[in-house]
Amino acid sequence: SDPNSRATVQLDGNVGEFSPVLIAGTTQPFAFERFTDITFKFENISLPVFNPYSGKFAGYNIAKGKLFTDLHYQIDNRKLEAQHKIRIDQLEWGEATASKEEATLPVKFATSLLKDADGVINLEIPVSGTIDDPAFRVGPIVWQIIKNILAKAVTAPFKALGALFKGAEEAQFIDFAAGSAALDPAA
């Protein structure tokens, strides 16, 4: 009952059969706004479990994908510093829903901008401020989008060239006579 006392929190479990969850840290349970230092980690969460929300707010169900999060919160005398590391692996949108509350955002296009060449979305979202008025910076998200766009633009011509030369594993070198550009009939 002492508001200055601190408690250690350590919860290990699973969401479903294959998705580990860890919640660990220290807090003042009767005055968390004075001091909290806690981490929430979720791994391998199957994204289709969020279909009731994605269908309602994004206008699409989720066909597949996995969610991994590492969320860290520090509160010291009402001052918040938080770091959200989020990885979404192989997100694929499914069928459109008939939601009246969906955001009119191009979610499929936005997803394609956020994905890297391996189909992974990595986001780091810092939040800082007082717990009465937290703010977050979108700069890291914008830079991630720009990096992914540039990577796709740089590799696109090479992917097209690679598609032209399918079966190149059977290609062989052709020897020319010195100073000649004529092909040998056997080539």
Residue ranges of model-derived segments:
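Extended catalytic-interface subdomain
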Residues: 121-124, 130-137
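Periplasmic peptidoglycan-binding/tethering modules of Gram-negative envelope proteins
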Residues: 136-187
